[in-house]
Swiss-Prot record:
Protein task: May modulate chromatin structure by regulation of nucleosome assembly/disassembly.
Region spans: Disordered: 250-269, 301-364
Name of the protein in its database record: Nucleosome assembly protein 1;2
Lipidation (S-farnesyl cysteine): 361
InterPro entries, alphabetized: NAP-like_sf, NAP_family
Compositionally biased residues, Acidic residues: 259-269, 304-340
Statement: the UniProt record of this protein carries the keyword rRNA-binding: no
Parts forming coiled coils: 32-86
Subcellular location: Nucleus; Cytoplasm
Residue span of motif Nuclear export signal: 53-68
Modified residue annotations for Cysteine methyl ester: 361
Similarity comment text for this entry: Belongs to the nucleosome assembly protein (NAP) family.
Domain remark from Swiss-Prot or TrEMBL: The acidic domain is probably involved in the interaction with histones.
């Protein structure tokens, strides 16, 4: 479990990232060697900085580095203890998640519901069990996930019964599991997404692996079939069909793949791939850190309102800082005006008008 504040670091990987399908022992050795070379280059650069300092200043910086080293040792222990603490509480959460699963899927009934339901439900209406479309609505209420869920995905996601996540140690990372009821779209009862990390504390993604979905004929949601009428005069009178990939939440289970080492990849393609991998990680970490632990709050919309409120407060803080900056600029302008008047001069008209512009115009 993360605190949700980690950001995926893919910088420096570029086109040299090993094949995402599987890292061989040789690939891993090459990756480690590449990282070592990068670190050695950075160390050499740091040495140059130290050598450029005066002896007394250099000595002070060396002592500061020793202090930093002690801090890093403590931080490493913190990460170790945090992982153990998270594992402890994850086990304590499990019974609560099990109760949630049973209520959501109608396995058990909560106290007092049976009699109330009998009194309120019309005789001709079939009584619904559990909480219908619980996970679908929980995810739709999150801004990032709602952009991924297409209208045609919703019918399939109504069959989603539960979402779980597990930390994995070899290799480091985490795994998401999506449990589905029997449905008319695909055979799989469980769809998984696994993230392998080079470093968990400073998350650097090695690769992501998703389940291959076994779609029933004509039910694939990640592709659409286009039918085109044949040209006039053509001997073939049957419509021409063409299959194209389309946007879908279920593309999440087919993560971006890094090309093989021997394939050339230009800078633009590498940047595009990096952005795709970062977005994919954001979706996975959002489900892990926000949706799973606070599912009912996302279902009701409370969590979305809380995030909106936090965003408004952050914006107001930014506006206050901008206003303070503007006041400082105005004060400086007033001082300059006073000086000019003392000297018998006047502020040019153009400058005076510019000083009266709204703050947002100055920032453009």
């Amino acid at each position: 479990m993360s605190d949700g504040k980690d950001s995926l670091d893919l910088s420096g990987l570029g086109a040299a990232v090993p094949n995402a399908k599987e890292l061989s022992a040789e690939d891993k050795a090459n990756l480690v060697e590449s990282i070592k070379n990068t670190l050695q280059g950075l160390a050499a650069r740091h040495t140059d900085v130290l050598e450029s300092l005066e002896p007394k200043v250099r000595k002070r910086v060396e002592v500061l580095r020793e202090i930093q080293s002690q801090h890093d040792d403590l931080e490493a222990k913190f990460f170790e203890e945090r992982a153990a603490l998270e594992a402890k509480y994850q086990k304590m959460y499990e019974p609560l998640y099990s109760k949630r699963y049973e209520i959501v899927n109608g396995v058990v009934e909560v106290d007092g519901v049976t009699k109330e339901a009998a009194d309120e439900t019309p005789a001709e209406q079939k009584e619904e069990k559990g909480v219908p479309e619980f996970w679908l609505n929980a995810m739709k209420n999150h801004e990032i996930l709602s952009e991924e869920i297409q209208e045609r995905d919703e019918e399939a996601l109504k069959y989603l019964k539960d979402i779980k996540w597990y930390r994995i140690s070899e290799p480091k990372g985490f795994k998401l599991e999506f449990y589905f009821d029997t449905n008319p779209f695909f055979k799989n009862s469980v769809l998984t997404k696994t993230y392998h990390m080079i470093d968990e504390d400073e998350p650097i993604l090695e690769k992501a692996i998703g389940t291959e979905i076994e779609w029933f004929p004509g039910k694939c949601l990640t592709q659409k079939v286009l039918k085109k009428k044949p040209k006039k005069g053509s001997k073939n009178t049957k419509p021409i069909t063409k299959t194209e990939n389309c946007e879908s939440f279920f593309n999440f289970f087919s993560p971006p793949q890094v090309p093989d080492d021997d394939e050339e990849i230009d800078e633009d393609t590498a940047e595009q791939l990096q952005n795709q991998m970062e977005q994919d990680y954001d979706i996975g970490s959002t489900i892990r850190d926000k949706i799973i632990p606070h599912a009912v709050s996302w279902f009701t919309g409370e969590a979305a309102q809380d995030e909106d409120f936090e965003g408004i407060m952050d914006d107001e803080d930014d506006d206050d800082e901008d206003d303070d900056d503007d006041e400082d600029e105005d004060d400086e302008g007033d001082d300059e005006d006073d000086e000019d008047e003392k000297k018998g001069g006047r502020v040019p008209a153009g400058e005076g008008q510019q000083g009266e512009r709204p703050a947002e115009c100055k920032q453009q």
